[in-house]
From Swiss-Prot:
Protein name listed in UniProt: Small toxic polypeptide LdrA
Organism phylogeny: Bacteria, Pseudomonadati, Pseudomonadota, Gammaproteobacteria, Enterobacterales
A Gene Ontology cellular-component term: plasma membrane
Keywords: Cell inner membrane, Cell membrane, Membrane, Toxin-antitoxin system, Transmembrane, Transmembrane helix
Subcellular location: Cell inner membrane
Xref: InterPro entries: Toxin_Ldr
Membrane-related topology note: Single-pass membrane protein
Source organism (scientific name): Escherichia coli (strain K12)
Length: 35
């Protein structure tokens, strides 16, 4: 495994949950503002 491959796996493991959390928070806040 090269350093680039390790960095990509590490980035995806960190970025995926963070992005999911941001998207979820955005949808929840939009849903609350809509009501």
């Amino acid at each position: 495994m090269t350093l680039a491959q390790f960095a990509m796996i590490f980035w995806h493991d960190l970025a995926a949950p963070i992005l999911a959390g941001i998207i979820t928070a955005a949808i929840v806040s939009w849903w609350r503002n809509r009501k």
